[in-house]
């Protein structure tokens, strides 16, 4: 995959959360990308934080993406409109619940939530790595692993990083056919005794 290079014309900085929200309210429907320049804490410069910016993005149907270094005092965080069929995390589901209770979600943000609930992406939201467990593995993947003694043996030795990776890669598939192929590939990988992330020897 080709590296994503920030477009200088799409780099902006905002001193406050309110300033970023004003920009997104005016541009959420016509812009396709924003590289938010966030100043580091020790820079002494006033800046919206990534946590604040994510709240604003979720309210307007956008989502955060990759982060890139910029200079000694700041970094860039990419924000884009949430794409159809994009996966949700449990963390962002929790953020939406908080923002909804606070009355901050706009109709644009709620539309993304409603679409995710309608097609199952909301229920399939992935857990953070720190809470990844065998119970968090999608049922169809678990069933396929359970049907293979060799895959089951490898699966029993997986740590949180690999459990998270299995769940994420399965839930990231956009179609039933793609999901079935991904599950078959993951089971075959486990049958070979391989893992997505190298496991530490115990």
Predicted ranges, named:
Residues 1-202:
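Charge-dense, helix-prone N-terminal extensions
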């Amino acid at each position: 995959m080709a590296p994503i290079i920030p477009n200088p014309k799409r780099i902006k900085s905002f001193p406050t959360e309110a300033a970023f929200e004003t920009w997104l309210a005016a541009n959420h429907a016509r812009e396709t990308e924003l590289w938010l320049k966030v100043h580091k804490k020790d820079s002494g410069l006033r800046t919206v934080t990534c946590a604040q910016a994510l709240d604003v993005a979720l309210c307007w149907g956008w989502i955060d993406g990759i982060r890139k270094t910029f200079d000694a005092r700041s970094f860039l965080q990419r924000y884009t409109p949430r794409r159809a069929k994009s996966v949700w995390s449990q963390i962002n589901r929790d953020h939406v619940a908080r923002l909804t209770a606070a009355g901050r979600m706009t109709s644009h943000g709620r539309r993304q939530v409603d679409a995710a609930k309608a097609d199952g992406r909301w229920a399939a939201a992935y857990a953070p790595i720190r809470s990844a467990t065998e119970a968090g593995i999608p049922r169809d993947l678990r069933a396929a692993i359970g049907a293979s003694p060799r895959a089951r043996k490898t699966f029993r030795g997986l740590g949180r990083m690999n459990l998270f990776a299995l769940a994420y890669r399965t839930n990231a598939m956009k179609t039933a056919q793609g999901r079935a192929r991904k599950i078959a590939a993951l089971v075959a990988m486990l049958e070979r005794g391989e893992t997505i992330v190298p496991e530490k020897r115990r």
